[in-house]
Amino acid sequence: MSMSTEFYNFQFESIEGNKMPLKNFQGKVVLLVNTASMCGLTKQYAGLQELHEEYQDKGLVVLGVPSNSFMQEHTSEDKVKDFCETNFNITFPMTKIEEVIGSEKHPLYGWLREEHGIKPKWNFHKILIDKEGKVVNSYSSLTKPKSEKLIKIIEEKIKG
C-alpha cells in the first residue's frame, strides 16, 4: 500500500504546549475534530471520549482541535483544558487553540481545503484519515461521534 505522506508533514502544538507531529500517528486511523467549549454541540465531547476509550487500543486516534473560528471557544488553553477535563474527563490528545477557517487557519486545514475541498462549516466537523494518511471522508457537525455510519467506517478502516 502506498503511504500518502502529506498528512504526516503537518504538526500541531499540543494543548500542554508540546510539539505534536502528525507523523506520530502513522499507522493509526485519525478522527480529526475541531472542538469548542461553548457550542450547542459541545456535548459531543462525551461521544468523542467514548470513541477514544473504546478504540484507542485498536488503532484510533481522536484528535481534538479547539478552535475559536466560530467564536465559541475559550481564549486560553488552560481554560479549554480545565473545561474538558472537568466536564467530560477528556483524555484524548488535543492541540492548542487553532483557527480552522479564514486567512489564519492552521496549515493542515489549508491543505484539507485546497487538496480535498474540506472546510469546516461549524464546530465539531469531523475528518477521518486512514492508516496511510489518506483522507477517507468528512462528516458534518451534526454527525454524532457514536453514529452508526461513523463507527462502521472507523471499524472498517482499523481492520483494513
Where are these regions (language model features)?
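N-terminal "domain-start" segment that seeds a small globular fold
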Residues: 1-23, 43
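Thiol-based oxidoreductase modules, predominantly thioredoxin-like and allied folds used
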Residues: 59-76, 91-102
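Acidic-and-aromatic substrate-binding clefts and catalytic sites of carbohydrate-active enzymes
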Residues: 39, 70-73, 145
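Short, internal strand/loop/helix patches
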Residues: 79-123
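Conserved helix-turn-beta segment immediately C-terminal to the redox Cys motif
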Residues: 28-29, 38, 43-66, 85-88
